[in-house]
């Protein structure tokens, strides 16, 4: 939960979600606005974007935009003025204000939840207070963050049959404020076969009913639901947009921001986590590892494995991602030249050394081993055994190449 305490400082930026608060994604924003402005709005949209791409913030901002635009189309009241003349009342965007605070009566939210006690059949509204707080504070968070936020610990989240029935009930009601009734369903991957209860409603919804589904993994969404939705694909955030946001919101230097943006590869959640460990000198740790593998021998290798094993899973994964990032940049350096690399001076020098140390096939083989290691860390592998095994594999991958100290 320290991660959530750390992110409190972004609250002032993202408390009310509008398109102006979104990091990058200008092409997607324009596409969404044109859907509404040109009356081309499908009744069911599926936003698909990887973790940290901003798919959820975009969906939140879009729902606010829809209700604000529908208010503009309402007739303006004409009343008698103070002296008997006609007076036109200025329209107040009350609905947009409610939507930006996540309390609009016509915008309903659905998301994975857990039973509060044994035998419960939980629905999303049981956690609506926590949900509003979560999306105000951590709009770029993932489902793991959300489940930890509500105290799930090791419990699995789910969108239940009871929740599907509650969705059907909510959307059968008459709208209160807006022309539209909106259901924003986050992580439809957590809909099991009970999601089929929603098929008829999605296919033939009541008039002016809008479904907005937000997913990370298209392959895990029920095909029957997928086929009934218009897809909106959210790409990873552009490197420059990520760096700009880190400078403006997290007060990083431009060099720090570019380094973190490069490693996070368009995942803003990952970028925020990397800020927590910005003081970690991954480059020195990597240099020690490679020298232990190629030059110093078994004693140095065991010492290094002891060091990395004490860091904890999150730091271990970040270290592996950093090494993978440098390997990818090294390959780009070979093929594209220095001017196209988002690297600091020290990282560029290190990438050049990696190119002297390994050829492309070796770099690709190392990247595969690092990916496997990250996969096993996610599944609670023994860190000492894992990193010792990777150390041995690195030696055999590079063994046929001339040994160069990574100074």
For each predicted feature, which ranges?
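Short, Lys/Arg-enriched N-terminal segments with co-localized hydrophobic residues
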Residues: 3-16
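Loop/turn-to-beta-strand initiation segments
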Residues: 177-182, 206-212
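Clamp-loader machinery-focused feature within the broader ASCE/P-loop NTPase space
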Residues: 13-193
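Charged, glycine-rich active-site and insertion segments that engage polyanionic ligands
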Residues: 18-99, 207-210, 216-407
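Residues immediately C-terminal
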Residues: 190, 204, 220
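Conserved catalytic/switch belt of AAA+ P-loop NTPases
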Residues: 172, 197-207
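Conserved adenine-binding aromatic site and its adjacent loop/helix in ATP-hydrolyzing domains
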Residues: 169, 200, 227
């Amino acid at each position: 939960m320290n991660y959530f305490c750390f992110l409190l400082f972004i609250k002032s930026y993202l408390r009310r979600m509008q398109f102006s608060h979104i990091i990058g994604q200008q092409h997607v924003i324009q596409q969404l606005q044109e859907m509404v402005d040109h009356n081309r709005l499908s009744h069911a949209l599926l936003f698909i974007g990887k973790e940290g791409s901003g798919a959820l913030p975009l969906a939140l901002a879009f729902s606010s935009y829809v209700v604000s635009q529908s208010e503009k189309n309402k007739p303006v009241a004409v009343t008698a003025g103070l002296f008997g003349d006609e007076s036109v009342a200025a329209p107040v965007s009350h609905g947009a204000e409610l939507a930006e605070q996540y309390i609009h009566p016509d915008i309903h939210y659905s998301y994975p939840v857990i039973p509060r006690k044994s035998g419960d059949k939980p629905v999303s509204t049981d956690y609506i207070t926590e949900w509003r707080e979560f999306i105000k504070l951590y709009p770029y968070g993932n489902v793991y963050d959300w489940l930890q936020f509500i105290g799930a610990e090791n419990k699995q989240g789910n969108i239940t049959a009871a929740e599907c029935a509650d969705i059907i009930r909510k959307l059968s009601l008459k709208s209160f404020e807006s022309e539209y009734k909106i259901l924003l369903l986050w992580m439809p991957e957590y809909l099991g076969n009970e999601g089929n209860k929603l098929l008829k409603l999605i296919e033939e919804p009541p008039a002016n009913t809008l479904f907005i589904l937000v997913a990370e993994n298209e392959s895990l969404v029920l095909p029957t639901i997928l086929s009934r939705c218009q897809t909106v694909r959210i790409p990873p955030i552009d490197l420059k947009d990520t760096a700009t946001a880190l400078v403006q919101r997290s007060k990083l230097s431009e060099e720090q921001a570019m380094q973190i943006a490069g490693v996070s590869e368009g995942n803003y959640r990952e970028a925020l986590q990397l800020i927590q460990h910005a003081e970690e000198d991954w480059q020195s740790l990597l240099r020690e590892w490679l020298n232990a593998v190629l030059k110093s021998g078994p004693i140095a290798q065991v010492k290094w494995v002891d060091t990395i094993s004490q860091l904890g899973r999150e730091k271990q994964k970040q270290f592996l991602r950093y090494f993978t990032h440098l390997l990818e940049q090294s390959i780009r350096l070979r093929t594209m030249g220095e001017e196209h690399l988002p690297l600091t001076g020290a990282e560029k020098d290190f990438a050049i050394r990696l190119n002297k140390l390994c050829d492309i096939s070796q770099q690709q083989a190392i990247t595969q081993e690092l990916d496997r290691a990250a996969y096993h860390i996610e599944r609670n592998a023994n860190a000492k055994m894992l990193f010792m095994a990777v150390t041995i594999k690195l030696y055999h991958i590079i063994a046929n190449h001339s040994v160069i100290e990574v100074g």
